[in-house]
């Protein structure tokens, strides 16, 4: 009797051990299945991330190619212009000691602005934010040649007024605003190839003279189109 009871207990103990082993194997299989699924999900997420990064790079290349083509249409050097724009976007100062060309005057700006270019052919290109920008003469970077923004009480609380909606300025003819100007006048607002804003309209601009050259003193009323 005792032997039979002992054999029965041994059998039960062995059965319980086998059941525990089976449960452990099932649990491990489930863990491995979950781990495999997690690895697969991470792999898919990595593929999607790489695909998005590649698409972003392609989009950047397309924007640079488009900007270069538009810069070239203006008769400027795409490589120099793009380098300057990239530097300004990052808040850097443009290289005043190495101007884009021998006849151009261009911007030494704060990091609030993209760029302002000024050349000897009396053509001005203003890009995006107007906030106390000072253009420098290439022969004498310490002398302000043109100032945009300045102090205008009509602007109200914002230092830049509504000038963010101005995307590009074309300077023509020989008279505007406060008096005669050998530089030209603001006769139109045109699309700016370097800005996400396509066009705008300027409601009021006044000119004043800095040294021997006039400057745009204020842009105090603008409307997006």
Swiss-Prot record:
GO terms for cellular component: host cell cytoplasm; viral capsid, decoration. Keywords: Capsid decoration protein, Capsid protein, Host cytoplasm, Virion. The keyword Phosphoprotein does not apply. Its main location: virion. Coiled coil: none annotated. It is found in: Virion; Host cytoplasm. It comes from the Viruses. Homooligomer. The portal-like structure consists in 12 copies of VP2. Interacts with capsid protein VP1. The N-terminus domain points away from the virion surface. Minor structural protein that forms a portal-like structure at a unique three-fold axis of symmetry, following binding to the host receptor. The channel formed by VP2 may allow the delivery of the viral genome through the host endosomal membrane. Translated by a ribosomal termination-reinitiation process from the bicistronic mRNA coding for VP1 and VP2. This is Minor capsid protein VP2. It comes from Bovine enteric calicivirus Newbury agent-1 (isolate Bovine/UK/Newbury1/1976).
